[in-house]
Amino acid sequence: EITLKIIDDGIMNGFSTMIKLAGYIMFFSIAADFAGHLPLPGTALSGCVIGLLEITNGIYTVSGTEWPAEIKYLSAMAMVSFGGISGICQTASMLAKLQSSIRTYVIFKLLNAMLATLFTAALVCYLNHQ
């Protein structure tokens, strides 16, 4: 039988999850902003470091570089397919109650990023030679 307690618990669990994820997003957005102020040589390197932390700001930074469009596209593909450390921490937070290995997840995210970048590079090369 569905009671108000079950509904209340479901609502509170949903809010708790959303607040937790929002906290990670805010934390890594702030960390990415700090990383953008590090004395790194060039906007491109800064964009890659920011993208490693948090993909949205990383892609935005890389898009403003003077890199060729193909390199910007490859960088964005790598960032999106990896998901950033922010995404990994969000996933780890959600999997904390399970007995899942975050290490395995990270390995597969890295593999996903490598494969996506390689396939994208092959596609870019193919399209540039048409």
Describe the role of every protein-language-model region:
Residues E1-I2, S101:
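Secondary-structure junction/capping motif
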Residues T3-A76:
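Transmembrane helical segments that form the transport core of multi-pass membrane transport proteins
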Residues A69-Q130:
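C-terminal transmembrane helix pair
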